[in-house]
Every structure is written in structure tokens, then in C-alpha cells.
Amino acid sequence: MLLLAAAFLVAFVLLLYMVSPLISPKPLALPGAHVVVTGGSSGIGKCIAIECYKQGAFITLVARNEDKLLQAKKEIEMHSINDKQVVLCISVDVSQDYNQVENVIKQAQEKLGPVDMLVNCAGMAVSGKFEDLEVSTFERLMSINYLGSVYPSRAVITTMKERRVGRIVFVSSQAGQLGLFGFTAYSASKFAIRGLAEALQMEVKPYNVYITVAYPPDTDTPGFAEENRTKPLETRLISETTSVCKPEQVAKQIVKDAIQGNFNSSLGSDGYMLSALTCGMAPVTSITEGLQQVVTMGLFRTIALFYLGSFDSIVRRCMMQREKSENADKTA
């Protein structure tokens, strides 16, 4: 009886693996596709643009700094695979005025055709203890990280639905999967992206438009270097429990997942564990993905509890050291 049950289980799992590709999205062909990348003048955004360009895409780079845009354009053009490819640069703040963003997208589509893939990579990080952060910092991060993704997505979605094809990528962060000391403003803005993406995916899936939410770890970018300048000790020590990734690695994974239409995009074993742990009611791209989440949930939750204990220990040690230092100063 046990052998029969085991045989049935194995057959069922094999059937899932065979059927899964049949219900998964058809991969997006990048050769000749029009890819718009916001925040594309540096860091992960620039590397994503390069990765897409290597595969034959036409690129529209969107960022605020025109000089950085032109420099990024030169770097990207070095990776062309044919002489027909184009890199278009548009300088605009995607978080300030929706009408301006909409006009910019229209200009890009008039020159390079309908947008096949939008990558929302514009963003910034500011860390600090909750009571030390200015209220304006919370407003600024929500504007840049959240509305800066809403506006471009809203500008392309109608055309994508009409054409019955498209990909929209939201670049969140592992801090958009779990809240960490010092990230009360940043994490909130990145968690918001997850809610937007889940709701939007349910709306556009019948139109063959697929959403990808990327959760990159700490990545060696100019933005990360700037973030480290003001990072609290607790935040820095917690961050140092994992390694820093290269932007090229992150970009390759994001582009791969976006092409496949995967809802989640993560990197490494920690990223895989976090995505499985925090899947909740998020959509799955394949039956096997859902099965893996069900099977691994218990184990990953156990591991996560040890991580949380370690993080809490770091915070307590820092607090004790700070209080000891303050008491020493008072008695000096």
C-alpha cells in the first residue's frame, strides 16, 4: 500500500513538471523589442539595459541626470549585436508629474514603437531610526520608490493590453520582503510595490501582460554606496550577514525572469528562501513553483526564526554598547 502511494505521488509530481510549461507564459522575444528602463543611467538599471541590448532590444533610458544618461548610452551602445539597434535617452523625474511621464512615454513610442517591456528601476534608499528621520523623508521615498513606478506603468499599460503582450518589472528589494532596523521609510515604500504588483497582475493577466517583482539583495551600486554613508550601526551589521552582489548578476536574473513572465525574481539561496517564505497569496508562474513553496515553507520558516533571533541580538548588543558609552561620558 505504501509503495502504491509513493508511486502515485512520484507520478503526480512528474505530471506537474510536464504540465507546468504548458500553462506558463510564452517567453517574450527581446530581439527588436522596445524596452524602457527608468533609473537607467547607473547601477542595476543600466546593467538591465545592457543585458537587454545584448539580446537585440531597442532601449529607452529614462533618468533625471542628462549627463549620466549620455554616458550610460555610450556604454550600452558598445554591446550592440546589429547596426539597427537604438538607445534613446530622455531626462525626466518619473515621480513628480504623471502628465509629463505620459508624454515622455508617447515620445519614446513614436520613435521606437510600442513598449514591450517596462523596467521600473528608479529609486533611492535612506536609512535611519524612525524617530530620527524627517517626515519629509517618508514622503520623498514613497514618491520616488512607489509613485515613480506607478506613473510609468500607468502610461504603458493601455497599449500593452490592446496589443495583448507586455512585461512590467518592478524593482523592489529584500527590504520589501522583511522589515529591518533602520528601514522604516525605505521598507514601507518597497512593500507598497508588492501590493501594487499583485493587484495589477490579476487585472492584466487575461491580456497576456505579465508582472515581475524583483527583490535584489545589497548590490554594489552608486546608490548603495550613498546609502552606507548614513546607515545606522545596527542596520550595517545586519546587512553584513549577507554578501554584496554585482549589479550585472542581478540584472541578468531580472531580465531572465521578466522574459519568462515570472512574478518573483530573486537571487541566491537567501533570495529564494525569502520569496518562498513571503509568497502569501502572490501569483505563481508554474505549478511546480507553487509546489516548491508548499514543500519548503516549514523548513524555511524554521531557518528564518534563527535569522530573526540573530538580528534581534545585534540590536540588543548595539543598544547596550550605546548605553554603556553614554553612561561613561556622564561619569567622565
Curated annotation (Swiss-Prot):
Motif GXSXG, chain ranges: 39-43
Q: Relate the assembly described in the record.
A: Dimer or tetramer.
- The record's active-site residues are S172 (proton donor), Y186 (proton acceptor), K190 (lowers pka of active site tyr)
Q: Which GO terms describe its biological process?
A: 3-keto-sphinganine metabolic process; sphingolipid biosynthetic process
Encoding gene, per UniProt annotation: KDSR
Entry protein name: 3-ketodihydrosphingosine reductase
EC annotation?
A: 1.1.1.102
* Classification via InterPro entries: KDSR-like, NAD(P)-bd_dom_sf, Sc_DH/Rdtase_CS, SDR_fam
| Classification lineage | Eukaryota, Metazoa, Chordata, Craniata, Vertebrata
Xref: CDD domains: KDSR-like_SDR_c
Where is it made, tissue-wise? Answer: Expressed in all tissues examined. Highest expression in placenta. High expression in lung, kidney, stomach and small intestine, low expression in heart, spleen and skeletal muscle. Weakly expressed in normal hematopoietic tissues. Higher expression in some T-cell malignancies and PHA-stimulated lymphocytes.
SUPFAM superfamilies in the record, alphabetically?
NAD(P)-binding Rossmann-fold domains
Family per record: Belongs to the short-chain dehydrogenases/reductases (SDR) family.
Pathway field: Lipid metabolism; sphingolipid metabolism
* Name of the top EC class for this enzyme: oxidoreductase
- Where along this sequence does the record place binding of NADP(+)? Y186, K190
| Residue ranges annotated as Lumenal topological domain | 292-293
